[in-house]
Amino acid sequence: MTRIKRGYIARRRRTKIRLFASSFRGAHSRLTRTMTQQRIRALVSAHRDRGRRKRDFRRLWITRINAVIQEMEVFNSYNRFIHNLYKKQLLLNRKILAQIALLNRSCLYTISNEIIK
């Protein structure tokens, strides 16, 4: 009985995984089983951290806005500032407000004065 060579499908799957794991260190980029395990773990971490990144940036923006507001002493808290912002129907999101707070504090001061009026 002649020897039958295996097909290319499994090899193609492994090379695809190997390309994904080529930047990993040690056995994680060399051994097939650990490569597949690390690939799954990397994808799980990426999926989890996409949601976490959104939360982290929102927290950073809120912290920056709060710091500048308390320094200006127009409002004594962040939540009063945001509440009055919504009451006056000034639609500025936290990302834009944080950029204004960092780059142009006088503009944020005029915004807060508009809210008070």
Curated annotation (Swiss-Prot):
Keyword field: Chloroplast, Plastid, Ribonucleoprotein, Ribosomal protein, RNA-binding, rRNA-binding
GO molecular function, one term: structural constituent of ribosome
Keyword Ligase: no
Source organism, top-level taxon: Eukaryota
InterPro entries: Ribosomal_bL20, Ribosomal_protein_bL20_C
Cystine pairs: none
Subcellular location(s) per record: Plastid, Chloroplast
CDD domains in alphabetical order: Ribosomal_L20
Pfam families hit by this protein: Ribosomal_L20 (PF00453)
Biological process annotations from GO: ribosomal large subunit assembly; translation
GO cellular component, one term: ribosome
Family to which the UniProt record says this protein belongs: Belongs to the bacterial ribosomal protein bL20 family.
Described purpose of this protein according to its UniProt entry: Binds directly to 23S ribosomal RNA and is necessary for the in vitro assembly process of the 50S ribosomal subunit. It is not involved in the protein synthesizing functions of that subunit.
HAMAP family according to UniProt: Ribosomal_bL20 (MF_00382)
Protein name (Swiss-Prot/TrEMBL): Large ribosomal subunit protein bL20c
